[in-house]
């Protein structure tokens, strides 16, 4: 039989006299532990959902902006060691004339390939359809902007693209892994009434920005286990002096402008 020291006996008596307080402390500790487990489970669930969404819609690993590069460079990009898929596109800014706004809104417009399947940053179409090949002024609008203005497929928007005023017809509303929330570069909070994201057929958008036969944006998907830094270096070599800004990989998953 283990002998209990007088101090331990006193401790047990004191604990016995404070049953209510000890029970309350135990409840607080149990609640804290439960909250920690719930928070960790929620974080794990959100991360798993995010990763599955990015993988399902083939979110690119490397993005690069250019002034101009010929479409013939596309094949060279796909041959870079460690690259699983390469996508080139035209990206630009537009000004929007919207009713109810005292000042013009603005947006980003991105091209959709017509002569080949889209490989990266796939759109998830919520309503409507994609622009038809050879169509004129048909666009897909980001869902956040469409909801802020009550736009539906079939509505039109007055826009200025590279100095030319056009009437854009919304044929679809979509989500994109590239725009977890739709905001201007550098903004921490979205302003969905004054900024929107749109997608248009590549040939028409390239013509609007005087980029016929060329592109100004690159997306790369790095193969599993690939060296992202090495891919960026090879991309820089492939483009040589045509790149506009230093290349940047995807530093985090939370937001991509």
Residue ranges and their predicted role:
Residues 1-257:
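Membrane transport/envelope proteins' first extracytoplasmic loop
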């Amino acid at each position: 039989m283990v002998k209990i020291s007088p101090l331990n006996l006193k401790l047990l008596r004191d604990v016995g006299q404070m049953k209510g307080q000890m029970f309350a402390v135990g409840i607080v500790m149990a609640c804290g532990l439960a909250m920690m487990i719930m928070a960790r489970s929620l974080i794990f669930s959100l991360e798993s959902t995010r990763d599955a969404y990015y993988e399902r819609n083939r979110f690119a690993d490397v993005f690069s902006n250019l002034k101009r590069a010929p479409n013939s460079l596309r094949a060279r990009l796909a041959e870079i060691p460690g690259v699983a898929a390469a996508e080139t596109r035209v990206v630009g800014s537009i000004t929007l004339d919207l009713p109810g706004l005292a000042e013009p809104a603005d947006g980003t417009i991105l091209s959709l390939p017509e002569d080949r399947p889209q490989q990266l940053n796939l759109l998830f179409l919520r309503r409507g359809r994609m622009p038809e090949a050879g169509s004129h002024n048909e666009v897909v609008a980001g869902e956040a902007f469409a909801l802020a203005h009550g736009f539906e497929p079939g509505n039109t928007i007055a826009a200025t693209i590279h100095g030319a005023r056009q009437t854009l017809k919304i044929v679809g509303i979509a989500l994109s892994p590239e725009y977890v929330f739709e905001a201007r570069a550098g903004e921490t909070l979205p302003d969905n009434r004054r900024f929107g994201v749109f997608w248009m057929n590549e040939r028409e958008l390239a013509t609007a920005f005087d980029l016929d036969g060329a592109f100004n944006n690159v997306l790369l998907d790095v193969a599993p286990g690939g060296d992202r830094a090495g891919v960026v270096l090879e991309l820089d070599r492939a483009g040589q002096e045509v790149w506009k800004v230093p290349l940047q990989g995807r530093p985090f998953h939370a937001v991509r402008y």
